Amino acid sequence: MMSNEKEMTGTTIIAIKYDDGVLIGADSRTSMGAYVSSRVTDKLTQITDKIFVCRSGSSADTQMISSYLRMYLSMYSQLEDSIPQVQRAAALASKIIYENPSLLAGLIVAGYDDKPRVFNISLGGSLTERDWAIGGSGSAFIYGYCDVNWRSGMSLEEGIRFVRNAVSCAINRDNASGGCIRMSAISRTGVQRYFYPGDKVLQ
């Protein structure tokens, strides 16, 4: 018998500003109910050279929104002959979620235009700009850690340590988070990617 359950990125996602840019991170588990459908999902979706979407919620819904954003921003960039702004991407994602309440999508849109930008978009579509943002089922376990330990002006190395600790903590406590840890650092000079396999998740 076929299951009607959606594949969920029930998830830990995080984005922070550091001294030169934005650092994003996520776990890699997706599931359908109690069944773990993938342990290596990439929840950090690149939609332009320097704008990413961190996805939590329904895999299908969040992938659809990300694909639409990528298409729209590519067309906008060509028509306007300008580099898309992070705020434009976030505002469009917020509008899509708000106007389609059946979508199960909580997103963080982060990147670098003229400065580092981090936007949190809730399941209902509300949009807020933050210095750091977390989302997904694992976020409940790391809010206190992030609130106490994040500080303005962290170096990239400090940011990587902060994000790795936060996602590791969520993986160790949230049954819906797991797998490996992926990160991307987005700055004026480009994008750097980091990967920690499951045996490198901090205990």
Swiss-Prot record:
Its EC number is 3.4.25.1. Keywords: Cytoplasm, Hydrolase, Nucleus, Protease, Proteasome, Threonine protease. It catalyses: Cleavage of peptide bonds with very broad specificity. CDD domains: proteasome_beta_type_6 (cd03762). The active site is at T11 (nucleophile). Residues 1-10 form a propeptide. Its main location: cytoplasm. It is an enzyme of class 3 (hydrolase). The keyword Cytoplasm applies. The keyword Cytoplasm applies. One of its GO terms (cellular component) is proteasome core complex, beta-subunit complex. GO terms for molecular function: threonine-type endopeptidase activity. PROSITE patterns: PROTEASOME_BETA_1, PROTEASOME_BETA_2. It holds the Pfam family Proteasome. One of its GO terms (biological process) is proteolysis involved in protein catabolic process. It is found in: Cytoplasm; Nucleus. The 26S proteasome consists of a 20S proteasome core and two 19S regulatory subunits. The 20S proteasome core is composed of 28 subunits that are arranged in four stacked rings, resulting in a barrel-shaped structure. The two end rings are each formed by seven alpha subunits, and the two central rings are each formed by seven beta subunits. The catalytic chamber with the active sites is on the inside of the barrel. Belongs to the peptidase T1B family. The proteasome degrades poly-ubiquitinated proteins in the cytoplasm and in the nucleus. It is essential for the regulated turnover of proteins and for the removal of misfolded proteins. The proteasome is a multicatalytic proteinase complex that is characterized by its ability to cleave peptides with Arg, Phe, Tyr, Leu, and Glu adjacent to the leaving group at neutral or slightly basic pH. It has an ATP-dependent proteolytic activity. This is Probable proteasome subunit beta type-1. It comes from Encephalitozoon cuniculi (strain GB-M1).
